[in-house]
């Protein structure tokens, strides 16, 4: 006989599925608002930012319109309270937005982070 206590079914880990894109099941722990912000940031980064970043590296330019677009979408100042013009979202939401922009370009993610945290 084993001296180890048996796990109750509710305490046993779910070994039935593994999602390599979300190994820690972060998505299950997010609020609806956090998921919406993440998805909006991902769509912007993939659909609007990525092609312009490729062109910017090739042509050695920066497109100032990107900063305005990110601001209009609320991607700058995610955690700043609404009464000051931000979204008033959580730091988890900020991290999710930063991760989606980082997937496309580290430079724009850095710019976004600086402008988002300047109020601290």
Task: Please give the residue ranges for each predicted region.
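Internal helix-loop-helix
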Residues: 72-118
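Short secondary-structure junction/hinge motifs that connect adjacent elements
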Residues: 51-72
């Amino acid at each position: 006989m084993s001296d180890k206590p048996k796990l109750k079914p509710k305490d046993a880990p779910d070994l039935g599925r593994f999602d390599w894109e979300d190994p820690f099941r972060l998505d299950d722990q997010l609020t609806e608002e956090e998921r919406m912000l993440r998805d909006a940031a991902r769509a912007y980064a993939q659909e609007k930012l990525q092609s312009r970043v490729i062109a910017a590296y090739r042509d050695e330019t920066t497109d100032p319109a990107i900063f305005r677009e990110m601001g209009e979408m609320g991607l700058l100042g995610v955690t700043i309270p609404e009464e000051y013009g931000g979204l008033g979202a959580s730091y988890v939401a900020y991290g999710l937005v930063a991760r989606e922009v980082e997937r496309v370009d580290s430079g724009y993610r850095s710019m976004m982070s600086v402008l988002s945290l300047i109020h601290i």
